[in-house]
């Protein structure tokens, strides 16, 4: 699954939930059609309730414009929307995990064609940058998330890393601090001292977190892929020799450990440390697990005082030109992006709203103290290179292959170079 809502496990959705909202018909005339990802994981948490209310309120305020919303599982939405566009049946809008391939094809309206200047300027800066191709904003960030390093305070106390009451909080500065904590946890019999989910579900997130903490990442300052950079090779050599080989990452090989499995183990109290996002913290607290959350420690190879960004993730609203409904789409998006609506949606799923003003004025589920930590991290985060049209293909290659870099008898450099070669080929196909 993609995007900020990667925690959602769709509840057996085999067909779109069409007819959501106040509309009827096939999207013709003055009916707008939005295809959106399903963020809920049960009927009770389905996104349908949100869209029903928003579309009804919008039509009441704008008589004559109806909105039809179709909900699709995260596993299907990118493929299905691509199929719709290719067959000449593009929706008016889509909310999903990627946009740049459609922008590269000239299929999308830009933000300045849809929103007021103040609305366009309201997006958090890292999100606006990731939503732009060149200097033009095509992907309108909707909700977002960032990652922090979580630790189980009870397991840390048992290992003598913090006091029994959890104070003072653990404050790792470098990878060596994390390694030392993992060793102490292993000595106490913790099953996963550090959970390293490099399985195919979401390996690209975990890999990027570690690469950024060593001054690396997926792309250079010019936006070109740098997957096999010296910094990234050093990162995976360290992970392999210092964490995986000594057994500090648990019994499941990282290449086979998916994020969902790592999160489930954390909620069972079997994980000392892992990288997580707001919804996991809320789930853990509901189960009585006290969680500490800190910034990812940096590589021992970086200079003193360097403060690399964390990983940010966003989901994107985009508007297609095909049906020529620019004015109606603009009215609807101005309505959806009102603070109360954006904060309500984000609060339902413990995500972060994408705009400056919605972040400052919580409503609905709102931001609590826990979420504020993630918002602070998001303001300085680095997002995936989603504005590169090849990203969907490249991210899939990373997810399926990066875990091999820490397997026994394998050269991390060779694995990274193989991924880089595939990324280069994908980039050429998209130009």
Give short role names for the model-derived ranges.
Residues 2-100, 414, 421-431:
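Conserved N-terminal structural module of periplasmic/extracytoplasmic solute-binding proteins
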Residues 92, 120-156, 304-310, 381-388:
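A structural signal for short loop-to-beta-strand junctions that line the ligand-binding cleft
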Residues 97-148, 177, 206, 290, ...:
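Hinge/lid segment of periplasmic solute-binding proteins
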Residues 112-123, 166-171, 193-198, 216-235, ...:
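Short, solvent-exposed loop/beta-turn-alpha elements that line the ligand-binding surface or hinge
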Residues 137-142, 147, 175-226, 271:
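Extracytoplasmic/periplasmic solute-binding protein
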Residues 157, 376-431:
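Conserved C-terminal helix/tail region of periplasmic/extracytoplasmic solute-binding proteins
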Residues 180-183, 222-256:
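Glycine-centered hinge/linker elements that transmit conformational signals in sensory
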Residues 241, 245-247, 285-351:
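Extracytoplasmic/periplasmic substrate-recognition and gating elements
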């Amino acid at each position: 699954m993609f995007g900020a809502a990667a925690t959602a496990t769709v509840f057996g959705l085999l067909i779109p939930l069409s007819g959501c909202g106040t509309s009827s018909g096939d999207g013709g005339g003055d009916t707008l059609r939005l295809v959106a990802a399903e963020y809920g994981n049960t009927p009770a948490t389905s996104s349908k309730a949100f869209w029903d209310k928003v579309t009804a309120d919008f039509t009441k305020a704008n008589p004559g414009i109806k909105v039809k919303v179709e909900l699709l599982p995260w596993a299907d939405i990118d493929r299905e929307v691509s199929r719709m566009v290719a067959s000449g049946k593009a929706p008016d809008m889509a909310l999903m995990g990627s946009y740049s391939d459609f922008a590269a094809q000239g299929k999308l309206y830009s933000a300045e064609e849809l929103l007021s200047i103040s609305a366009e300027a309201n997006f958090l800066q890292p999100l606006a940058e990731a939503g732009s191709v060149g200097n033009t904003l095509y992907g309108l960030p909707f909700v977002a998330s960032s990652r922090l390093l979580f630790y189980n305070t009870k397991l840390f106390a048992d290992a003598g890393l913090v006091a029994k009451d959890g104070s003072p909080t653990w404050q790792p500065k470098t990878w060596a601090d994390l390694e030392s904590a993992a060793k102490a946890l292993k000595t106490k019999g913790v099953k996963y001292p550090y959970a390293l989910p490099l399985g195919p579900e979401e390996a690209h997130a975990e890999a990027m977190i570690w690469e950024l903490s060593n001054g690396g990442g997926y792309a250079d300052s010019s936006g070109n892929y740098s997957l096999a950079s010296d910094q990234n090779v050093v990162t995976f050599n360290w992970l392999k020799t210092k964490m995986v080989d000594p057994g500090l990452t648990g019994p499941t090989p990282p290449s086979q450990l998916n994020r969902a499995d790592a999160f489930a183990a954390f909620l069972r109290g079997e994980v000392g440390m892992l990288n997580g996002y707001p919804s996991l913290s809320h789930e853990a607290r509901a189960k009585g697990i006290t969680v500490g959350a800190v910034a990812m420690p940096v590589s021992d190879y970086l200079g003193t005082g360097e403060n690399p960004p964390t990983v940010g993730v966003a989901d994107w609203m985009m508007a297609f030109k095909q049906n020529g409904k620019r004015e109606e789409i603009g009215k609807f998006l101005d309505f959806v992006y009102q603070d109360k609506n954006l904060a309500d949606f984000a609060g339902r799923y413990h995500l972060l709203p994408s705009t400056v003003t919605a972040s400052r004025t919580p409503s609905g589920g709102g931001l609590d103290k826990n979420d504020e930590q993630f918002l602070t991290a998001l303001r300085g985060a680095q997002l995936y290179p989603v504005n590169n049209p090849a990203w969907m293909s490249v991210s899939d290659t990373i997810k399926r292959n990066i875990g091999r870099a820490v397997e026994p008898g394998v050269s991390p450099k060779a694995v990274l170079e193989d991924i880089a070669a595939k990324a280069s080929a994908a980039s050429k196909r998209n130009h």
